[in-house]
Amino acid sequence: MTNSNLRTENHFDYVKITLASPDRVMEWGQRTLPNGQVVGEVTKPETINYRTLKPEMDGLFCEKIFGPSKDWECHCGKYKRVRHRGIVCERCGVEVTESRVRRHRMGFIKLAAPVSHVWYLKGIPSYVAILLDMPLRDVEQIVYFNCYVVLDPGDHKELKYKQLLTEDEWLEIEDEIYAEDSTIENEPMVGIGAEALKQLLEDLDLPDVAEQLREEISSSKGQKRAKLIKRLRVIDNFIATNARPEWMVLDAIPVIPPDLRPMVQLDGGRFATSDLNDLYRRVINRNNRLARLQEILAPEIIVRNEKRMLQEAVDALIDNGRRGRTVVGANNRPLKSLSDIIEGKQGRFRQNLLGKRVDYSGRSVIVVGPKLKMHQCGLPKEMAIELFQPFVIHRLIRQNIVNNIKAAKKLIQRADDEVMQVLQEVIEGHPILLNRAPTLHRLGIQAFEPKLVDGRAIQLHPLVCPAFNADFDGDQMAVHVPLAIESQTEARMLMLASNNILSPATGDPIITPSQDMVLGSYYLTALKPGASVPEFGDQSRTYSGLEDVIHAFEDKRILLHDWVWVRFNGEVEDEDEIEEPIKAELLSDGTRIEQWTYRRDRFDEDGALISRYILTTVGRVVMNYTIIDAVAVA
């Protein structure tokens, strides 16, 4: 789909992160302009011209590579205005287009010598070391030009493939090879630096190595077996992703778009720049110097030193401080590399992609709401009016209370009773989501029915606290409003707090009474030592139903721990040890009375129960009545 602003919409199924091949890196940065010119390679370390304040050509902010700094205007100013769209200026070579292309167009730096990628060399585990089946220390010695490695032992009897040699050892072997009496025809080959590493990785035939490892694993055990499995797993991943091991050594490095590493002018005329520009500048300077040294056929020791410095510059760009000395800028502050921008809490993923601010959300301190039902939460009116504002405006206009959105907003700002009435109608049956960070499991975000409350704190039912791992010592929670009917339905069906009683991890109840609930239940049902037990028939202590006991307690005629006789026709689980009744009496009308310690039953002539009185405390009646009432409502 394309509109007049050249915006394109690409549909894709998934995002896949794999190793990039050298060709892919070049593809990212290389473009062919409409006039057939190929651009993309950054060859100069300059950023902007200090007099004209325009980007330098072929530099880190080059307009030819990355696009124009100003919309529809080329570098030299020959073409201005949108009518020249797509034209490439003959003088400066800049394509006339929007400046926002500088946010996604990349460049590349073609390296004069291969360089190892520090993530794969110095990461934990080191994938390069695992693939080559060499100690990491040895691989580092090769990459940083401390030791030679044997790439091909030739006819030399003492040399082995992948053996390390110091400078002196290799000089001795060279003397031996080129001596007049030498019998070596097939000369051994050695290498040093990332070039040698690349050669070793290219020599790996992954399917063959995987097959050999599987055979070795079947006949080995213990630590050796674990090491072989570790290596096989890495090789299998390379095969599965169609990646080559030598891609871990870079021939070209991508240059990220200039608007992602900006340079801005401050009030005093000075410039503030992203650390990445300094790191890229070091790489380009060293790369250009190395290319020049190679051109003039400089001594090997000087070229080798420059290659090592280039390796260190690329290491600092990718992950500053991972190896060697940390590169610092002004006032001894370490420069932020690409890895520092991506990783950690303040990194691109956690801060900007996963931690985005979202619309229709808010946050506030939580306080206990003991009078709420479990599926309810108290939402401050001030917060609710802001979160549900579009719904309130829609309803105000639909009910002809106001004529337009502007009038509705003015009315909402006054927050009079009419608006509050509409807000109450809007939130009725509209669930909201409450989330407490850190969301460690799925019960860290649950749905509730909002109830409007005064104040500025969110009220939370105490029973849902264990699921959120919340307490009321200053914890904050975020509120989100599901907008679509589908998301509201999903929230109500799947995420409502009263539907999430069991822990998804263990299957045990996660909503269990605690603290004052347990204490209150204990206090209600506790028996007071030494309390007098009334005789059955005592008018002040015998009641015809549970409600009568509660009314008497509310009228303060009886206390919470007083014993009472109360008529109760339900099932009674009696823990009385006496199987026979204490007293049995046959009345003149043929009915029979049986009395136990805590129960008095009356039966008719056929043995059917006529009435039952139980001896209990007022607190236990309150507890029982409350449970029956709650179950009946549910």
Curated annotation (Swiss-Prot):
Its cofactor is Mg(2+); Zn(2+). SMART domains: RPOLA_N. It comes from the Bacteria. Mg(2+) binds at residues 471, 473, 475. InterPro entries: DNA-dir_RpoC1_gamma, DNA-dir_RpoC_beta_prime, RNA_pol_asu, RNA_pol_N, RNA_pol_Rpb1_1, RNA_pol_Rpb1_3, RNA_pol_Rpb1_3_sf, RNA_pol_Rpb1_clamp_domain. GO terms for biological process: DNA-templated transcription. It is an enzyme of class 2 (transferase). One of its GO terms (cellular component) is DNA-directed RNA polymerase complex. The keyword Kinase does not apply. Binds 1 Mg(2+) ion per subunit. Binds 1 Zn(2+) ion per subunit. The keyword Transmembrane helix does not apply. Keywords: DNA-directed RNA polymerase, Magnesium, Metal-binding, Nucleotidyltransferase, Transcription, Transferase, Zinc. Pfam families: RNA_pol_Rpb1_1, RNA_pol_Rpb1_2, RNA_pol_Rpb1_3. In cyanobacteria the RNAP catalytic core is composed of 2 alpha, 1 beta, 1 beta', 1 gamma and 1 omega subunit. When a sigma factor is associated with the core the holoenzyme is formed, which can initiate transcription. Belongs to the RNA polymerase beta' chain family. RpoC1 subfamily. DNA-dependent RNA polymerase catalyzes the transcription of DNA into RNA using the four ribonucleoside triphosphates as substrates. PANTHER family: DNA-DIRECTED RNA POLYMERASE (PTHR19376), DNA-DIRECTED RNA POLYMERASE SUBUNIT BETA (PTHR19376:SF54). This is DNA-directed RNA polymerase subunit gamma. It comes from Prochlorococcus marinus (strain MIT 9313).
